[in-house]
Design a protein with these regions (language model features):
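Acidic/His/Gly-enriched intrinsically disordered linker/tail segments
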Residues: 4-113, 117-163
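Beta-strand-rich domains and repeat architectures in extracellular enzymes and scaffolds
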Residues: 162-179
C-alpha cells in the first residue's frame, strides 16, 4: 500500500489541486504486478518470522522453472490476466518476490524505494525507463541476469535435494490445477 500511494511531480500537483484521483494521484498502482506484489511479499518476509519469501513451495516452483528452463515471460508476470497453467496468478507473487529479492541483493534495498519513488514522479517513462534511469539496466537485462542467478542458485539446491533422495508423487486427478 505504501509504495502505491507515493506521489511526486505532476501527480503531487494534481493531488494538491483535486484530492485523491486514483490513477492520476497514485501512479504506482500502474507498476508491473510482479513488482507491486513482489515488494509486498519481500517486506512480509523481511519484517516477520514468516512470509512467502521463505516458502519451500515458492522455491519448488522457481526451482522447477529454472532447472527445466521454462520460465514465464516478463509480460506474463507483469499483468493480472488469468493464466491457464499452474500456478496461474500466483506467478506474479512467486516470481515477483524472487526478482525483488534479487534487485535488493544486487543494487541494495534502497533501490526498491528508489524505483517506486522515480516511477511515482515519472510514470510516463514506464517501468522499463525508470529501471534504466535508476539502475542502469534494461528490463530485458534485469530479466536475463535474474534468470542466470536463479538457475545457478536452483541448480545447487536441486543437487542437494537429489543427494537426500527424491520422493515420487502420485497423480490423483487429470482435471488440472483448478480442482
Amino acid at each position: 500500500i505504501f509504495q502505491m500511494d507515493m506521489k511526486g511531480g505532476q501527480a503531487e500537483s494534481i493531488y494538491r489541486a483535486f484530492g485523491k484521483v486514483p490513477v492520476l494521484t497514485s501512479p504506482n498502482m500502474l507498476l508491473p504486478f510482479w513488482f507491486l506484489e513482489g515488494l509486498a511479499v519481500y517486506y512480509e518476509t523481511r519484517l516477520t518470522q514468516a512470509g512467502r519469501g521463505r516458502s519451500s513451495i515458492y522455491d519448488m516452483y522457481l526451482r522447477t522453472a529454472a532447472l527445466q528452463d521454462e520460465f514465464y515471460t516478463i509480460d506474463e508476470i507483469s499483468s493480472q490476466y488469468l493464466m491457464e497453467s499452474w500456478p496461474g496468478l500466483q506467478a506474479a507473487y512467486i516470481y515477483g518476490v524472487s526478482l525483488v529479492t534479487y534487485i535488493a541483493g544486487i543494487y541494495g534495498e534502497e533501490a526498491l524505494w528508489g524505483l517506486s519513488r522515480a516511477f511515482s514522479e515519472t510514470p510516463l517513462l514506464g517501468f522499463g525507463g525508470v529501471l534504466e534511469d535508476c539502475l542502469g539496466v534494461t528490463l530485458g537485462q534485469l530479466w536475463g541476469d535474474w534468470q542466470a542467478w536463479l538457475k545457478e542458485k536452483m541448480l545447487s539446491q536441486g543437487e542437494a535435494i537429489v543427494r537426500q533422495g527424491l520422493v515420487d508423487g502420485e497423480q490423483i486427478t487429470r482435471r488440472g490445477f483448478r480442482v
